[in-house]
Design a protein with these regions (language model features):
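Terminal alpha-helical anchor/extension segments at protein ends
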Residues: 1-115
């Protein structure tokens, strides 16, 4: 009945979120490999880019410390950056947490130096 339909819709929506998260992480990885001045990662480096309004999309692991997450989201909102929460339910999401400290950003423009 209706309950099953709602449950199925939730599963589909969760799947769509994962697809979107995966696409964002793939985009980040491609930029990192091919045009690394368009991305940055790590808490301090991302903070610097947020401070000058250079962040287009902020990627945050859902496993980040909540206070840190709140601070970064607030800074992103002040500059109009998009914020995407990325779960560790798939390889690229786990990699965000493991390799980049759970914090990365796709920039609005190429930075002069990486970081």
């Amino acid at each position: 009945g209706l309950y099953e339909l709602v449950e199925k819709a939730e599963d589909v929506l969760e799947g769509l979120d994962l697809v979107r998260e995966k696409k964002l992480m793939v985009r980040f990885m491609k930029l990192l490999a091919n045009d690394d001045r368009m991305v940055t990662y790590g808490v301090e480096e991302v903070r610097k880019k947020l401070a000058i309004g250079a962040v287009d999309t902020l990627l945050l692991s859902t496993e980040l410390d909540k206070e840190l997450m709140h601070e970064l989201v607030e800074r992103a909102e002040e500059t109009g950056a998009n914020v995407e929460l990325v779960t560790t339910d798939f390889e690229e999401g786990a990699q965000l947490k493991r390799a980049f400290g759970g914090v990365a950003a796709i920039l609005r423009y190429r930075s002069k130096v990486h970081g």
